[in-house]
Amino acid sequence: MCIRDRVGMACLKAGIHVLIEKPIAANEQEARELIAAAEQAGRLLQVGHIERFNPAFRELLNVVANEEVMILEGRRHSPHADRANDVSVVLDLMIHDIDLVLELAGAPVVGFAAAGGRSAEGPIDYVTATLNFANGVAASLTASKMSHRKVRCLSAHCRDSLVEADFLDRNLRIHRRAHESYSATRGELLYRHDGFIEEVSITPTEPLYAELEHFLQCVRGAAKPAVDGLQASRALRLADLIEQAVEQPHQSLQQLNTPL
């Protein structure tokens, strides 16, 4: 175990509730050990998938609850930096969107495909992945540490709308088609109403503050963890499968024998 996970394990065994940074652990075995320790101690284990507390995602979740989601699209790009060069882009960046689409899709993953690579020696630093869910929803995710600008966006393509969340600007836009196509004249000009865009008002909140406040509420028994050990372990498992697929190029869509 890394130092972080060893400290988390020690706290759980000492009877202390734990909020641990994502990913939950370096591998599935260590994740299972942390989950078991929390259960044995009767203590909370919450995992810091902080984008769950981004106000843009929270509003996106509310909006799509009343929509028929068809495709989810996540883009998480960063320019090259000296930090986090010892970890792959999947575990550093993409795992955020893996967690979010698992929550939004609300169904097991039954198949996936992934491709990517590295610009130099070291971990993978650009990846694209496609996920197929049991309910017919599909997700397309891209993550890169080689971009020329920082991007943090998640879109939900729904039957009657396109919902776009920007996690950096913390805004949400809903593109809708007009229910009726109609024409109107003004002088000699002809107008046609094809659709419109809604700018959703979002209450500004700091995700880290909201996450810590939520953890305190969980400790006091007023809420359940937004991301518990099992949910975080599921995201880690899928991230591991994506990494393995990238290391084995030229493979087509892989079906999972056991839906994830």
PLM features: residue spans?
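A contiguous active-site-proximal alpha/beta segment in oxidoreductase catalytic domains
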Residues: 25-84
